[in-house]
């Protein structure tokens, strides 16, 4: 496991564990997450599940994600706006961050409807006490508009590309 090693290298890096199936994030995974929480500060780890995966079995998802939160992990609802969740489920899911799908970010600078949809998503999240992350940021203009709208976090090639763990460790060493 490389997470404790990353924690030694850099005390600020956040890690994301992605699940595209609520069943995958079930009881076996909860046991794994308990072990990880004993070795790494769980507040530095985000567990991300897609909206469509969460809606396959919403009651089960609520139970699993509530357990995950009780371990100290932050829960992210990914690809928001692309699945089939109702506002009732959005209210019940124990997520702390709403991740706005790249399909809404892509045309943000050129399409008034895309911008308005993102504004409403950010406003809704804020009203529910959730932070927001926009994914798929590829231009300075998208980044500027999202900051103007009040989106809390961003993700995309403009901000950084995914790297293998070995490169991340090497990069942490050279910047410390």
Regions found by a protein language model. Name each.
Residues 31-39, 63-71, 120:
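Catalytic-core regions built around general acid/base machinery
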Residues 3-6, 14, 18-27, 44-57, ...:
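EAL-family c-di-GMP phosphodiesterase catalytic domain
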Residues 1-6, 32-36, 67, 127:
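Amphipathic alpha-helical regulatory segments at dimerization interfaces
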Residues 61-64, 86:
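Short beta-alpha junctions and helix-cap segments that line functional grooves
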């Amino acid at each position: 496991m490389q997470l404790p090693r990353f924690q030694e290298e850099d005390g600020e890096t956040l890690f994301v564990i992605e699940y595209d199936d609520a069943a995958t994030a079930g009881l076996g995974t909860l046991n794994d997450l308990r072990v990880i929480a004993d070795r790494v500060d769980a507040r530095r780890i985000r567990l991300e599940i897609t909206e469509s995966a969460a809606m396959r079995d919403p009651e089960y998802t609520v139970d699993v994600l509530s357990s995950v939160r009780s371990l100290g992990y932050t829960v992210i609802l990914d690809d928001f706006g692309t699945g089939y969740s109702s506002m009732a489920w959005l209210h019940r899911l124990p997520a702390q961050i709403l991740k706005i799908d790249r399909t809404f970010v892509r045309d943000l600078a050129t399409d008034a409807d895309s911008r308005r949809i993102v504004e409403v998503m950010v406003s809704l999240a804020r009203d529910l006490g959730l932070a927001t992350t926009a994914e798929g940021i590829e231009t300075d203009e998208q980044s500027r508009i999202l900051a103007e709208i009040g989106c809390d976090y961003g993700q995309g090639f403009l901000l950084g590309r995914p790297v293998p763990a070995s490169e991340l460790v090497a990069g942490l060493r050279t910047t410390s």
